[in-house]
Amino acid sequence: MKKILLSRLFLASSAVLLSAFGIIYACADGDWDYLGSYNSNFTPETFADKSYSPLFLSGGIFYGIGFDTQHNSRFNKNIKSDWADYLKGKVDTTTVNYFLIGDEKPRYYSDDKNTIKNKEEIEGLHVYYKTKKENKSTQKWGKKLNLKDEKVKNFVEFLYLAQKIETVSIGEDYWSYDPVVAKTFDDAKMIQSIENVYNTLSDPFLKNRYWFLTMKARFYSNDKQKAIDFFNKTESSVAKNTLYYRGLAYVAGINYKQKKFATSNYLYAQVFDKCPELRVVTAYSFKPKNQSDWTKALAMAKNNKEKAALWAIHGYYKDEKQAIEKIYELDPKSEHLNYLATRLVNSLEQKINNSFQIDGQGENQKPKPQTVAENKAENKTKVDNSAVDLIAKISAAGNTEKPYLWDIAIGYLQSLKGDYANADKNYTKAEKTLPKTELAGMQLRLLRFVNNLSKIDKLTDKNEKTILADLNWLYYELPKNYKGDTFRYQNASSWSRSYLSNLYKEKGDFVMAEIFGESRYSYW
């Protein structure tokens, strides 16, 4: 008898704690995704690379970021690192970053007094190299830099030219409803001089950067076709690195402007596949106008990986299930499958009724309460059987990049379908390939808890004990100890309270039913 009372006391105190958290979550302001933490048990970050995160299922434009605002800063880290390596021993990292980036803080008003003068100083150093005459820039930097060093000179001269192109390529740091007029760089002589430097260089580091600078200058010129001509003439000799794929993205953009949509989409898919930093950009830019454009783009693919990349973006806009089927046939190890699988599972979750209520039939009709059995029966019909079959097939084969993703996904869907025994088996199978990360461990534990609680149709002293440890973890330990904002446990927390409340109500224990009955649905 004491054990039962202790169990009840523990459950009650935990429920009260969670009720307080529920009020906080319901009333707090903040940036959270309508299709995120509060509507899902399946955390996509567990399974897909960070570069895909804006493409996770979202109620907004892009998951977690809303809009893509990194157009000016996306490659700052790469640029600083590359030049720091080139200038190692010649220029300290702080100085390199100063000249390359300047002040990275967005400025919303004019503040000439505090404006960093890095661009003016680069121009002054360029004038010094050209005239050999001292000026303010050499007076400031002459003692800090060896201006006679060849690498220092190369750095300054490159930045001088790059900053000229930045006058048209760098956008403002604010968002506007008004359409932005595209700027062009019309100094044909300077563009040609950049290309001429590229042609004369032998140093691979500098040659690679002047190649990209030429592409960038041609892209922002009033004769963009010359960018494509230059790319076609030189691409075979260019290293297939980030700069190459940035250049290829320019070619894709020009083709789009020329209304060559199939070519544009084919090229964007290549960039999506090979350059993670540009995934959000290429996904946004990928726009087949009709089925013919899509078919032509597919026909351009030279191999299965290129076809898989096309389907990977197509699945973002259209049908994740179809895209998964196609990619799995083409390349089972494709990492693109991971993010598409999370989108598919998250979309299936959205159809599940966690409120234990049915909407009223007429206007102003109150929702009708459901029993646990009625709620389970309804939800079983909402899970797409063809999606379950597809994920089960891939899980059984075990030949993807991340087998645990498919094992956990099918286990979760089996829980929703009421197939608890097979869900247990697949969770056990997932453990064999599960990475030893906090997020992966928490994800598996959470879904096992959902499965274990779902097994309970009637509460007994015996089956209460099977969930006590996980309830303590979910209601008390996680809110107290988990400092991140990625792991999706709030939905399971709210659902489990509603589930237990209904079980206690059906048992005739109305005190416990009332304690567990408070959920986020009470505040909406």
Task: Specify the residue positions occupied by each region the protein language model found.
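Extracytoplasmic/secretory-pathway proteins
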Residues: 22-216, 221-524
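Gram-negative bacterial Sec-dependent N-terminal signal peptides
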Residues: 1-26
